Amino acid sequence: VPLRRAGTRLLAATVTAMAAGIVAGLLARLLMRAVTVLAGGEPGFSLAGTLAILLVFAGAMLPGAVATAFGRRRSGLVLLGLGAAVLMLESVAIGLQENPGQLFGSGGTTTVLVVLVMLAFPPVILGEALAVWRMTSALAARRTVPAPRDDARARR
């Protein structure tokens, strides 16, 4: 892969991983806040915490995005899947760090709401992985410089 094309593909991978990571990270941050509220905790947004979540969500998708941008579609899918699995594991672990006894011991409505909030994490994360794969594939397929036309071939 020529250096210019490699740079373009790397940029496409980085931009798509960052864009999808920001959107999915913000949605996950809101879901984490909902879990905190349901646990009876004091919800708070720290800028450092939010930026860390956005960075983790973007960083988890970057290896898969780079592999996809360089035409390694299967490797890209595997890496995106692994990144999504890590994010799901961490999302559940962080959600359950809030007082689990309070979350599931309250019974009734609170338990149902907690389960619904926890079930919202996988679609957000899988949506992020799918968006990264599709956007990276589309951007990497675009040419940066049009190929020179051979007039003799064009006339045939």
Please give the residue ranges for each predicted region:
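Juxtamembrane/disordered regions of integral membrane proteins
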Residues: 1-156
